[in-house]
Amino acid sequence: MFPLLGLFGGTFDPIHKGHLALANELIQKLPSLTEIQFIPSRQPPHRPSPLASPANRLEMIKRAIANQPNLILNDVEIKGNDISYTINTLKILRPLFLTHALCFILSTDAFADFKHWHQSSVILEYCHLIVVNRPNYRLPQQPWLSDLLSHHQTENAEDLGRFQFGKIFFQTLSPRPISATQIRHYLAKGDYEIVAPLLPKTVLAYIKAHKLYQQ
């Protein structure tokens, strides 16, 4: 059996308690998943540029995951100078973790757009996909999606450790409708009390100290 290494990509603009809860619950529900690496993107392919700088986003993640040994910061995409394509990241990481099964973590709505990812046809040659539920979201009925799942989906979590790549596993998690977009909206207006329950204290303190996301 291969130990599982979780790869959690995103802008983390800013990282919030929903991100942390997702990672920790995944580790609880998948015992073979002993580590999740947070991989902030420099420039996501299908989204606007993050508002916070790469350096600020890295620092916020460091503060958010401090004292949580199962959660690790990986700056591989921040070090790049181009668009942060998942396939390029996987090609860098695969040789570094030859004894692990890489598990790329994504939401159901991101998975519904998987066909349009850069070199999506070869991504599953490098990793598994762990698709986590998003509140009140159902996958669209698309022929390409049905075909992909018929070849790669497994309902047995142990398959993620039996193979190093090529499986798609759906994991149901507790609903956490926290939106970074909404958080930025309130931060722009200086409504710190509203966002305080949604952000780690150390992250909110950093945002205040550096006046991030202000209009």
Curated annotation (Swiss-Prot):
Listed under GO biological process in this entry are: NAD biosynthetic process
CDD domains recorded: NMNAT
Residues folding into a coiled coil are none
Q: What is its EC number?
A: 2.7.7.18
Alphabetically list the UniProt keywords: ATP-binding, NAD, Nucleotide-binding, Nucleotidyltransferase, Pyridine nucleotide biosynthesis, Transferase
Give the pathway listed in the UniProt entry for this protein: Cofactor biosynthesis; NAD(+) biosynthesis; deamido-NAD(+) from nicotinate D-ribonucleotide: step 1/1
Q: Which InterPro entries match?
A: Cyt_trans-like, NadD/NMNAT, Rossmann-like_a/b/a_fold
EC class of this enzyme? transferase
Catalytic activities: nicotinate beta-D-ribonucleotide + ATP + H(+) = deamido-NAD(+) + diphosphate
Transmembrane annotation, as ranges: none
Mind telling me which HAMAP family this protein's record contains?
Answer: NaMN_adenylyltr (MF_00244)
Q: Please give the name of this protein.
A: Probable nicotinate-nucleotide adenylyltransferase
This chain's source organism reads: Coxiella burnetii (strain Dugway 5J108-111)
Q: Its gene?
A: nadD
